[in-house]
């Protein structure tokens, strides 16, 4: 197409800026574009939406927060590509609000929405479990200034920020599962279930072009969070098994949800496996040293940022979820044991 021929390739020439403005499509290969969508008030700063052009359809993969800036970016991208919303179908790599929230703004009646979910009710049920388990923990971890923010009145979920509230639109979902082939334009994507970062995470592999749209599963410079929101769910085991799947695919270019496209998928997978091994050992050592509850263990673990007590409440929330995931994995391996004390879970050596 003429629009594609007039656009810059994914790798910019020497001296060019590393990133284009939000909402400006960047050609990856004929028919496939990357669009940076802003994530206001979020350290990730941007989401990569991928747009696939077909003769009559426009497929958008991941859509951003429920925020006007996210809607504006996708509006700009479609206008630039000469497309309109009535041609759009949506594919979600997973349920997190930086990938799904914008549905509340862009969804139109009859729009096809694909996901590894039967219904968004599954996500709401998980949010309720989060509130039940982590509400007391967040109250304990909160500073006096943060304590009033733990719950939003009338909402059965933790109040972290407005962008993280549940979807109000309830589209019927077209269920994608392992081995399905999703056809978009001239592309045929194999669906790969990769739970761990999210129970409903999928990656999309295009074998002819050796491309992997990988969502948040394997990011080049960021370690994806892996959280357990209740102690019976071994999210880390699922994540490590999902990482192992990546060795099965011949991938020349990885298209992540955050950061720029990259190469070297298998090397990055090896790094992540080693990273989680080190984290497991660190948390085992903290339990052995007498730290026995989620808040104490989380606050003494090594994180990228110093002074855990002064962190924003949402960062404490995610750090405790990640701590829980590693502790549950250690319990499943028989290296530590778990007990219940009141409304808290305690951990100790066998």
Q: What do the PLM-derived regions correspond to, one by one?
A:
Residues 2-19, 285-350:
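C-terminal regulatory/interaction regions
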Residues 73, 81, 95, 99-100, ...:
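Active-site/pore-lining binding-face segments in mid-to-C-terminal subdomains
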Residues 93-99, 197, 258, 326:
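Histidine-centered divalent metal-coordination motifs
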Residues 31, 258, 283, 330:
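Residue-level signal for inorganic ion chemistry
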Residues 6-7, 30-37, 159-165, 185-187:
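Short Pro/Gly-enriched beta-strand edge/turn motifs at strand-loop
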Residues 58, 65-68, 158-173, 181, ...:
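Metallo-beta-lactamase
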Residues 66-71, 77-182:
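Active-site HxH/HxHxD metal-binding segment of metal-dependent hydrolases
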Residues 22-85, 203-215, 220:
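Conserved beta-strand hairpin/beta-sheet module of binuclear metal-dependent hydrolase folds
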């Amino acid at each position: 197409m003429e629009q594609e021929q007039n656009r810059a390739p994914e790798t910019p020439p020497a001296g060019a800026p590393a990133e284009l403005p939000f909402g400006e499509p960047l050609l990856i290969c004929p028919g496939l574009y990357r669009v940076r969508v802003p994530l206001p008030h979020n350290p990730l700063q941007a989401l990569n939406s991928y747009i696939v052009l077909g003769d009559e359809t426009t497929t958008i993969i991941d859509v951003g927060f429920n925020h006007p800036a996210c809607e504006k970016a996708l509006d700009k991208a479609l206008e630039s590509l000469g497309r309109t919303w009535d041609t759009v179908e949506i594919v979600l790599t997973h349920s997190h609000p930086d990938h799904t929230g914008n549905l509340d703004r862009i969804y139109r009646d009859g729009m096809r929405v694909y996901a590894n979910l039967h219904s968004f009710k599954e996500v709401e049920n998980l949010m309720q479990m989060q509130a039940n388990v982590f509400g007391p923990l967040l109250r304990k971890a909160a500073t006096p200034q943060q304590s009033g923010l733990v719950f939003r009145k009338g909402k059965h979920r933790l109040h972290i920020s407005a962008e993280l509230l549940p979807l109000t639109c309830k589209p019927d979902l077209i269920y994608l599962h392992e081995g399905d082939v999703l056809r978009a334009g001239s592309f045929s994507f194999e669906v790969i279930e990769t739970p761990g970062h999210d129970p409903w995470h999928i990656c999309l592999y295009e074998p002819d072009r050796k491309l992997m749209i990988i969502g948040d599963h394997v990011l080049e410079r960021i370690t994806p969070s892996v959280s357990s929101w209740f102690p019976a769910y071994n999210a880390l085991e699922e994540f490590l098994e999902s990482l192992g799947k990546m060795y099965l695919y011949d991938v020349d270019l990885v298209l992540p949800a955050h950061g720029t496209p990259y190469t070297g998928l298998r090397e990055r997978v090896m790094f992540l496996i080693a990273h989680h091994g080190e984290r497991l050992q660190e948390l085992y050592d903290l339990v052995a040293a007498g730290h026995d509850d989620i808040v104490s263990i989380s606050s003494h673990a090594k994180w990228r940022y110093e002074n855990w007590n002064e962190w924003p409440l949402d960062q404490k929330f995610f750090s405790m979820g990640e701590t829980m995931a590693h502790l549950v994995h250690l319990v499943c391996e028989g290296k530590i044991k778990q007990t219940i004390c009141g409304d808290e879970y305690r951990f100790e050596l066998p």
